Design a protein with these regions (language model features):
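Solvent-exposed, non-membrane alpha-helical residues enriched in polar/charged side chains
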Residues: 19, 23, 41-45, 64, ...
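Conserved donor-binding loops in enzymes that form glycosidic bonds
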Residues: 7, 132, 179
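PLP-dependent aminotransferase-like
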Residues: 68-157, 164
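N-terminal "arm"/small-domain region of PLP-dependent enzymes with the aminotransferase-like
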Residues: 1-30, 35
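Conserved active-site segment immediately N-terminal to the catalytic lysine
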Residues: 155-180
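Phosphate-binding glycine-rich loop
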Residues: 30-77, 91-95, 101-103, 168
């Protein structure tokens, strides 16, 4: 097997800082909704250029919460791409909605925006673009289509945290952004 990255080497490069931060949280005894979580949320919102950031258990939970917050419910349709981790579609199904898939492009493996409009029906309530491999989907086109059809945009940026699209961070351009 050819490893794609060396996580031990990555850890070693910031070991002291990570160990100190983890020990601070452990010694505080405050793991949920504590001072460290509040500080992280504030700093991460600043980093992403958003007003808020809310820490939750995992990326799937973040997507489910975002879908519910955007009013997506049973029987609604949500357009996304099949080129993603299964939790993108799983989160749509978890709220009782139906995932509607568009293909990805052969050069970026991101959502093929040319296919979005043909998938929109009266049941469509949202689009979940998936940012992958440190690249952002074409958010100008996606947001324009969403605005035209009055759809919500929920960004799945779990695989592109810190990625940049025309000066904006992944997860900061739609109605909600989910990063894990």
């Amino acid at each position: 097997m050819i490893p794609s990255m060396n996580v031990v080497r990555q850890y070693e490069s910031i070991r002291e800082e990570l160990d100190q931060a983890a020990l601070e949280v452990l010694h505080s005894g405050s793991y949920i909704l504590g001072e460290s979580v509040e500080r992280f949320q504030t700093e991460f919102a600043d980093y992403c250029g958003t007003k808020y950031a809310i820490g939750v258990g995992n990326g799937t939970d973040a997507l489910v919460i975002a879908l519910r917050a955007c009013g997506v419910k049973a029987g609604d349709e949500v357009i996304t791409t099949a080129m993603s981790f299964f939790s993108t579609a799983e989160s749509i199904a978890a709220v009782g909605a139906i995932p509607v898939f568009v293909d990805c492009t052969s050069d970026t493996y991101l959502m093929d925006t040319a296919q979005i409009e043909e998938k929109i029906t009266e049941k469509t309530k949202a689009i979940i673009p998936v940012h992958l491999y440190g690249q952002c989907a074409d958010m100008d086109v996606i947001c324009s289509i969403a605005q035209k059809y009055k759809l919500k945009v929920i960004e799945d940026a779990a695989q592109a945290a810190g990625a940049d699209y025309k000066g904006k961070k992944a997860g900061s351009m739609g109605d909600a952004g989910c990063i894990s």
